[in-house]
Amino acid sequence: MLTNLYFVRHAHSTYTPDELGRPLSLKGSRDAEVSNRILENENIDFIISSPYKRAIQTVEGIATFIGKEVAIEDGFKERTLSLEPVKDFNLAITKVWEEPSFSWPGGESNTVAQKRGIKAVEKIVNTHEGKNIVIGTHGNLMVLIMNYFDQKYDFEFWKNLDMPDIYKLTFEYKDLKEVNRIWKRI
């Protein structure tokens, strides 16, 4: 039985130091509407999201469309890069991708964040077998999850994601069978 997980990278957000409560920007809100229109054609059964406001806001339109609440799953929250703000984000993110077990003080390594994401994926695939599930999440974690199944989903792939972006991962039981990008600007 096939289970489809639609990973939705959140749309553009307005920067605030409040990582959890950072909202979508005006552009992000418009792009979220586009992503929701795309998902309306996918026979979605459930919506699950990271607890971060920008991820929830990106998928709440499809939840409204199907008449379901957005369920929160902490396993899909963004990876913690560092406890304190980093001085050079590009340097910091490059380092964790070059050395998967490396972490900045108070942060998660790629290995740790990936394990957290995969645990959440396995839970959903086991609980919602044969269903179509939207997952509102974050680019870095989404690519780490995809990388677990196929190494071609790497740092360069992450750098080229759109915001938002949508990837449909099709599972047969716990085996990933297919990955398709379904995001497109309308």
Kindly give the residue locations of the regions a language model identified.
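Acidic, low-complexity terminal tails and accessory targeting/binding regions
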Residues: 2, 38, 68-72, 78-90, ...
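Active-site-proximal alpha-helix that buttresses catalytic centers in soluble enzyme cores
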Residues: 3-69, 111
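Short active-site segment of divalent metal-dependent hydrolases/proteases
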Residues: 13, 141-142
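Glycine-rich phosphate-binding loop signature in dinucleotide/nucleotide-binding domains
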Residues: 41-43, 124-131
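Short beta-strand scaffold positions
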Residues: 49-50, 115, 136-137
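Active-site signature of alpha/beta-hydrolase-fold catalytic machinery across serine-
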Residues: 61, 144-148
